[in-house]
Amino acid sequence: MEKKRALLTVSFGTAAEEARREEIGGVEEALRRRVPELPFARAYTSPTIRRILAQRGTAVPSLEEALEEQLSAGVEQLYLLPTHLLPGYEYDAIAATVESFRPRFRDLRLAPPLMGDTDMVRALAGVLMERWRRLLGQAVVLVGHGTAHPGNLVYPALQGALSLAGRGDILVGTVEGWPGPEELLPVLERQGAERVILAPLLLTAGTHAREDIAGPGPESWKSRLEAAGLTVHPVLEGLGRLPQVQELYVRRLEQLLEE
């Protein structure tokens, strides 16, 4: 008798409706198109986001709740795909939860985060180089979340992949990790950049993008760059909106199916 299978995505989540629909939803839809025969479910890890959405009438389960629901539905083989970009504390918590549930499934498979290996870092660099064309006097600054976790190393790894490909005009920074504006401003000066395209290196263009990256506050990336005399053009576009990034998540799913 064939095992009952299903696909579960797990995201941090966002309360921004457009980002939830176009960016998280864009990734989810690409995955569903790849395996239309599998029942699909989603989970959000942020209690705050789940509470806000519940107040609006949209219930999204936690990972633990979603796993219990899959067990109740009789699922034996579950493919779990996180939309997280890097192997940080959030991903570690997901992995720990999965391990605690593993004995209760016949086959429970967890995909790595998007930038969980060198091949995917290089693939994402290729997508970014295609998205952001080189223009004289212009630099592109992409800002990720950042973390104190060793997984923060994926940001300089991505920068290395871009630089080795000859695209040193695309710079990678973080909100809460390294490098920050103080590290990137001297690089922009050496490059002679006059204009900066400022965009999030995040799945969704939510609160971090609108406040910490492109917000009006004095400590935002936009304000710090403008204070240095640069002309800044924010582009509030989450990575999940890009079809090429959606395809990278599909590649992660295909790896999971082949295990």
What would you call each of these model-derived segments?
Residues M1-E259:
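Active-site-proximal alpha-helix that buttresses catalytic centers in soluble enzyme cores
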